[in-house]
Amino acid sequence: MNTYKIYLINFDDGFIYVGKTKNTLIHRLKQHKANLISGKSYKLYEHWKSIDIDPSIECLECNLSKKKAIQLEHDYTLAYMFLNQ
């Protein structure tokens, strides 16, 4: 069974990113650089490139099924958007 992780990338300037991956986070970020995909993943990469701030990265949840990871990614994204208003 593939297990997923939910992680939070938090920049000091208020920009946050919540994402899910079944790979390591480093591998996932390399995928972002290799495949400049649209959406919030691309916004993360562009923001990271444009500033000189190293973000804090933390794992919020691990050992999740894909279905649960998708739901939690959505829930955490909404929660952090609400907190940063």
Name each model-derived stretch.
Residues 1-85:
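Structure-specific nucleic-acid interaction/processing domains
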